[in-house]
Amino acid sequence: VSRLEHSLQSATRAHRNGESEEMVVACLLHDIGDELAPMNHSEYAASILKPYVSEKTHWIVEKHGEFQMYYYAHHLGGDKNRRDKYKDHKYYQDTIDFCEKYDQNSFDPKYESLPLEFFKPIVKKIFSRKPYSSLTKN
């Protein structure tokens, strides 16, 4: 599937699973850096979201690329367990859950995603809210 379809599937799954609007937007945008920053796409996406999402959501998006290695690193000669360096982090399991529920399974050509238009008001709402001051002081 295309990157757009992957993102729509991810956001649709989160929405249908009752996730917060913030998480739905994070799912929609988690791979936005794939084209512009392929070597650090997670950090790129997280930096865009940072002022408008919680610390937890930011961390999940920032680290999801490393956590996704669990599913395909063995095909590239890498360490599928590299995520384990974060096993004591408070968002470790949340990031595993994100990858499992909304990323690695969102490449299904038969999945019926909601259209991009559905998500526009949610994206606008998240990006229109007052930035988190604790995250914008960096």
Specify the residue positions occupied by each region the protein language model found:
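Divalent metal-dependent phosphate-bond-processing catalytic cores, especially two-metal-ion Mg2+/Mn2+ enzymes
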Residues: 1-8, 12-20, 51-59, 63-138
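His-Asp-centered metal-binding catalytic motifs of divalent-metal-dependent phosphohydrolases/nucleases
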Residues: 13-45, 61-65
